[in-house]
Amino acid sequence: MLNSFKLSLQYILPKLWLTRLAGWGASKRAGWLTKLVIDLFVKYYKVDMKEAQKPDTASYRTFNEFFVRPLRDEVRPIDTDPNVLVMPADGVISQLGKIEEDKILQAKGHNYSLEALLAGNYLMADLFRNGTFVTTYLSPRDYHRVHMPCNGILREMIYVPGDLFSVNHLTAQNVPNLFARNERVICLFDTEFGPMAQILVGATIVGSIETVWAGTITPPREGIIKRWTWPAGENDGSVALLKGQEMGRFKLGSTVINLFAPGKVNLVEQLESLSVTKIGQPLAVSTETFVTPDAEPSPLPAEEIEAEHDASPLVDDKKDQV
């Protein structure tokens, strides 16, 4: 009965306005009130603040600052084996497995369309038919920055407007085509393991979705699909990210979907639905063997990442939109 009531609310409540209100409130500096809200949130969701770079809740000027708090480097070590892809987010695996032609498993008895997830982009969908997928759910208590499973060169980003259903286990089991209906940002990378898509899915009360190379992608919510492309390799203007490096973030919780090309990776055997994930832990293993490099490449300094994030050049210049 309670679950039926919760599902009914998903269709009745004004999700867009609730999301706008939450985003507005979370961005406000309210002094002692902000600290009180953060303290209550930490207590209710049992957030482990010892992992944060700033464990004192009084150090956060807004709720959003707290929500996207960076962690101490040593608490999420990255697996350095060049044959291993790592978890992109802290959370719980909702579903994982093989993409059956155009079908991706959402929950038991529920599939959705790969092509619909990719906003009808059949050329991109062709890269992943019969490939592998992993869906990771980020709960409110989790760290909400998203990282790279492997080295990658960004080739394309697509913003897809949509609904703002919650993306928890209840809605995944009961709302048809959930991830292909919700607002999302699709990021396509060239990697050593073939093409990889990392998709950031919005939800109710997700105030914004951001990337380190373009800043805030949504809001504004203009109701139109937007597309950006980048050059390959070392060409001017290319965007290269390293394994374990931050690539985006949510302001309030949501879901990350990873798509891998067929025959390129095998998921780690012990992973299953509801497995807990931590950034940097093994996610998949290459079907080919790579030689360990003599030296690991150095990631971009944190301050450079923040500078790129704050600049938001692509949000201001939308000449490549379609």
UniProtKB/Swiss-Prot annotation:
GO cellular component labels: plasma membrane
UniProt subcellular location: Cell membrane
PTM notes: Is synthesized initially as an inactive proenzyme. Formation of the active enzyme involves a self-maturation process in which the active site pyruvoyl group is generated from an internal serine residue via an autocatalytic post-translational modification. Two non-identical subunits are generated from the proenzyme in this reaction, and the pyruvate is formed at the N-terminus of the alpha chain, which is derived from the carboxyl end of the proenzyme.
Main localisation: membrane
Catalytic activity: a 1,2-diacyl-sn-glycero-3-phospho-L-serine + H(+) = a 1,2-diacyl-sn-glycero-3-phosphoethanolamine + CO2
Keyword Glycosyltransferase: no
Residues modified to Pyruvic acid (Ser): 254
Enzyme class (EC, first level): lyase
Annotated site, Cleavage (non-hydrolytic), chain positions: 253-254
Location of the active site: 90 (charge relay system), 147 (charge relay system), 254 (charge relay system), 254 (schiff-base intermediate with substrate)
UniProt pathway: Phospholipid metabolism; phosphatidylethanolamine biosynthesis; phosphatidylethanolamine from CDP-diacylglycerol: step 2/2
EC number per UniProt: 4.1.1.65
Basic and acidic residues bias spans: 308-322
Keyword Cell wall biogenesis/degradation: no
Its job: Catalyzes the formation of phosphatidylethanolamine (PtdEtn) from phosphatidylserine (PtdSer).
Protein name: Phosphatidylserine decarboxylase proenzyme
Native organism: Escherichia coli O7:K1 (strain IAI39 / ExPEC)
